[in-house]
Amino acid sequence: MAKIKLTKNELKVQKDALKMYRRYLPTLTLKKQQLQSEIRTIEAKAKAVRKEREDLEFGFKEWIAVFSEMDAFPEGIITVSNIRKGKGNIAGVDIPTFEGADFGRGDYDLYETPLWVDIAANHMEKAMSLDLEAEVLDEQVRLLEIELLATSQRVNLFEKVKIPETEENIKKISINMADQQVSAVVRSKISKRKIALRNAVASEKEVYSL
């Protein structure tokens, strides 16, 4: 704890600081709660997207087995040509949003290639799109967790350090100022008594001199 001046001006500084901490703490606490809620929501969405991806793969596993046996699925038939991302903002945090993906198809003869290859390619695009969406959601969570950590640290700083420290400073300064006031009153009374005593002695001397 830094050493403080036990003065009236310092008392005002400490009271203003305490007022500021108490004013901003509810806002920080609300932001912390909002971030926690948003993170849970996004994590649930990412889980749902991955579940959809798993269901898609499970429903298509027979096709995958056929591809493996026949070795007829062209290698590199699907490529991601572009990932479309937008921008969002949650609790003051800029985050990427997934808006879709563009895919390229490798060269293959539509007339000579079995129809199931084209159907499989469509399923692969859907699966890859879900993977990309989940990755963007993971990035959202990562960015929000960074902000949540910083916000939580500020909340803890205000609650456990700054507010108690400032309250203690105010108490310390107030006690010191009260002690000074008492001392000033005592000194004033002593001074008045001394003056009265001197006046009395002077009066007695005047009487004796007559």
Segments (PLM) and residue ranges:
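Charge-rich amphipathic alpha-helical interaction elements
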Residues: M1-L210
